[in-house]
Amino acid sequence: MTDAGLVAHLRSVRELDDALEVVVDVGNDSDRTLHYVAEVRAIDYDPATRRLRLRLSDRGRQLVIEAAMVEPTFRTVEPHSEASLVLSLPRTIVRLAPQAERSPEPRFEEHRIADATEVEVEIGWSRTPYYADVRARAEPPEAWEDGTAHASLTVRPE
């Protein structure tokens, strides 16, 4: 019996007319079904290095408003098999701009993530299905994860 975790391979990144498409192949070499987060939970982009990091995991994710917690979409990959996951992202993102001094008005900055030259993907996974715990003081969703699969790809500028 093998008890390996989820394995990820970033197959392709390409810019479409209205989106950035990222295709990830996930594999399961274990003897039981694995469950994984199947949607992007956070996008980190560094315009200076053109590094894009997609997190399909809630580990380390800082929520501004606890009520904003939305449960992710989950998928499964059967024992000794593979599956493909297609992620469709906007070509640009808008985020709060860092400010040297406090200001009552927030500033925003737009970044074109389709210009990324390095793409990394993290996928949270578990050996057990996720069930929401409605009890008070329940474990946070990221406690469900047994591990995180990582994949990266260097993208050649066109």
Which residues are covered by each model-predicted region?
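N-terminal edge beta-strand
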Residues: 1-14
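Generic beta-strand hydrophobic packing signal
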Residues: 11-13, 39, 43, 50-52, ...
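Short polar catalytic/cofactor-binding loops
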Residues: 14-15, 28
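Surface-exposed loops/turns
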Residues: 16-17, 79
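Structural beta-strand segments of beta-rich domains
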Residues: 18-22
